[in-house]
């Protein structure tokens, strides 16, 4: 059985330890049956996280299960609101300059090429998952005081068997104090990236995610770039992933830059976040001002799905409200900027009437 031992003086895996210290990595095969190690909590099937943003009610509870991000109805509404702007989805990327390619096509060939482009666009618009933050790992397996002081650095033992899903992979840390514990999520992510490198991900968090650098990116309207880098670097249920996404959404809401995420894979997650926070007023006004009234109605519909006991949902149900009427019900009941929404709706209706009369 091959073993790997590496000394690393600049990387301190344990945030609470004093000094830089040293860390040793050791890779081993699967532990013997009967060992103390147990699979990590919060996984299902082949190790895929199964926690949604809105978790199910506890077993045996009479509470009705709340909708989750991956529910079919929710996904259908979010996909509809996201939009399908092919020019934006396939906008030129920064790369080596090459001469453009021109093709002469028949009408049938053009229609087929357009169909293929739409299918490729739908793949690019597949939304990243939205999960609850993972539970911290604080499991201590043994306290071997006899080993205290024998080493000055930590040992990290990793099961590198290829057949094991990463979520179920055994990774433990031996502290200089003699404590044997399960590795924290951050330690696990780093070790897995060392042994099983993922394209676009670094072992250490890139400096772009520092607060001052994020603010610079936001000021340049590069919110999509931030979110794309975040998806590549972090696990979807990690604290950093959730923090960066929420911070980006809040900046977009603060300055009304919702259109930056429209026709991108991140629009659905943003809409879901605002609906959960009951902060859809800004996005709703933006949709109406851009003549996306159907999307605005879908946003209110999603709001009612997530908050069925609210006054808006109850009145809309009683009135069987749809379309503009659905938006008006929300504006009069639960909207934080109800008067502004009503004025925006009025301006939209007047413009629509004028346009109809002119034609």
Curated annotation (Swiss-Prot):
Predominant location of this chain?
mitochondrion
Q: Name one GO cellular component term.
A: mitochondrial inner membrane
Q: Write one Pfam family the protein is assigned to.
A: MRP-S22
Q: Which residues cross the membrane?
A: none
Q: Where does it live in the cell?
A: Mitochondrion
Write out the GO biological process terms: mitochondrial translation
Q: Name one GO molecular function term.
A: structural constituent of ribosome
Keyword Ion transport included in the entry's annotation: no
Q: Which UniProt keywords apply?
A: Mitochondrion, Ribonucleoprotein, Ribosomal protein
Q: Mitochondrion among the record's keywords?
A: yes
Q: Which family does it belong to?
A: Belongs to the mitochondrion-specific ribosomal protein mS22 family.
Query: Entry's PANTHER family?
Result: MITOCHONDRIAL 28S RIBOSOMAL PROTEIN S22, SMALL RIBOSOMAL SUBUNIT PROTEIN MS22
Assembly and oligomerization: Component of the mitochondrial ribosome small subunit (28S) which comprises a 12S rRNA and about 30 distinct proteins.
Name assigned to this protein: Small ribosomal subunit protein mS22
Task: Tell me what gene encodes this.
Answer: MRPS22
């Amino acid at each position: 059985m091959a073993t790997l031992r590496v000394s690393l003086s600049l990387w301190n895996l344990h945030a609470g330890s004093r000094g830089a210290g040293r860390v040793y990595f050791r890779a081993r095969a699967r532990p013997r049956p009967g060992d103390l190690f147990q699979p990590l909590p919060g996984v299902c099937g082949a190790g895929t996280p199964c926690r949604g943003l809105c978790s199910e009610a506890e077993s045996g509870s009479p509470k009705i299960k709340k909708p989750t991000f991956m529910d079919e109805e929710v996904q259908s509404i979010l996909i509809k609101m996201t939009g399908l702007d092919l020019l934006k989805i396939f906008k030129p990327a920064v790369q080596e300059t090459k001469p453009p390619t021109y093709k002469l096509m028949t009408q049938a060939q053009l229609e087929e090429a357009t169909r293929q482009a739409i299918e490729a666009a739908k793949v690019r618009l597949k939304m990243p998952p939205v999960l609850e933050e993972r539970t911290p790992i604080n499991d201590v397996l043994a306290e071997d005081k006899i080993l205290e002081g024998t080493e000055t650095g930590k040992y990290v033992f990793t099961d590198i068997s290829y057949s094991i899903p990463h979520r179920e992979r055994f990774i433990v840390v031996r502290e200089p104090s003699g404590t044997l514990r399960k590795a924290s999520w951050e330690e696990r992510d780093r070790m897995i990236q060392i042994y099983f490198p993922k394209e676009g991900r670094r072992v250490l968090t890139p400096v772009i995610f520092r607060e001052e650098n994020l603010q610079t990116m936001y000021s340049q309207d590069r919110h999509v770039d931030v979110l794309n880098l975040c998806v590549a670097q972090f696990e979807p249920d990690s604290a950093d992933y959730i923090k960066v996404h929420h911070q980006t959404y809040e900046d977009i809401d603060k300055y009304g830059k919702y259109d930056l995420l429209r026709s991108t894979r991140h629009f659905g997650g943003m809409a879901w976040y605002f609906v959960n926070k009951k902060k859809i007023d800004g996005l709703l006004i933006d949709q109406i001002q851009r003549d996306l009234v159907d999307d605005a109605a879908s946003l209110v519909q999603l709001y009612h799905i997530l908050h069925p006991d609210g006054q808006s949902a109850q009145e809309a149900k009683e009135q069987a409200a749809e379309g503009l009427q659905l938006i008006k019900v929300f504006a009069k009941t639960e909207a934080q900027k109800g008067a502004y929404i009503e004025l925006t709706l009025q301006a939209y209706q007047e413009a629509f009437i004028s346009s109809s009369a002119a034609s």
